[in-house]
């Protein structure tokens, strides 16, 4: 999420103008990052997941081709949190992306012709796919969505040439199906033992246990390891699933070729609050206490920024980046998150003012690390909730939640922020408050500029060192996507972002939900009742450059 381009700087960013725009034609939540390869920009829309190619060599970047996968309309009915898609990946002349109805597709980047299509899941049991694939060597890494539908999470690698599934690893169940074998050496004792994906669950609960893989994955070519997070256990009613509920709400390191697990760490054992573990893992090499370390940075929904040794899985530090009252910290000796008993949810009893809420102190929206400033730029939420556990039964293909939730703003009344965080010192350097959750990704550049968008539709540029606002532009709809920057054929630097409010946070607008029902969108509507007053649905690409 960092670019070495530096034509746009803190001094001249105020002069940015719109270079061109493009309508996606679908007014749902747009979470994708525009992808630029060989003078062509590629964009994947929300459902129906149309892939567009724009010609950057011509004025106005006209449409070169579009590919329409025509996913099943029924997939919209089982999507948890809007019909979003987080974008495409590229390698060896092909574009790879997922459809809401569980296909991974490869398309020829020059012609837009389908190369292969592989069915990965089944919408009839509640599975969907929303993540952006990750390219690693000759493979494509993908995973499923549907943690609120009682599905069983998995991650898989496909052959780039043929689309054949090379390996698939489940997030729950016996070691043989989780691809846990002799090479598995977790750092902490609580992750050691045989078939923990079964024994840390009651009876056969692991079969509907969640642990979906819908967020971000990272690949270290030197170690040949892929790192990815697993989502919440199902259902949200934690009393129905006593135990740690392995291997949910944590991070796996796996051999990219075989899928065999090397280590696992659980951010949220026996996840009580739907805090998952799917957020981004940023790979950095640093000096830590006088020793070189290969580390990863993981800002989790539970509100802690984890600094981890990515070779061993050891937690080196875990520092809060937003307000937390549901836990007191992470025990670095055991690796365990320390829950606050008074905030633990209970059956048929409302526990009030739990912070952070289920979307966490940040959700999927990716942060950005700048090696120039040494800061991590974290777009995050500032939300609390009232929560009550209720009994729920599993019916295939239907919601499997078991909780009543009402979210609300955190202390101070704002609902989001973006901050510059020094992970070496474990402290925030600056923070900019936002009225709504900062649901877009962050982009840092070598020009010491940080770009991000707001749910009202403002696209903003901040000084990377101080957080000072340098420039902003009002787009037609709220921004929940990932800004990107690129060097065009004319040699100039451009910045691109999709506008189109939605996602879990913006479902009240994109789904036209009734604000009187505060439990709608899994309780998010209660915190977003005023969002329809400031933005409307959309689906538009905006690209900016200097004059």
What is the role of each PLM region?
Residues 302, 443-538, 542-547:
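C-terminal structured "cap/appendage" subdomains that terminate the fold
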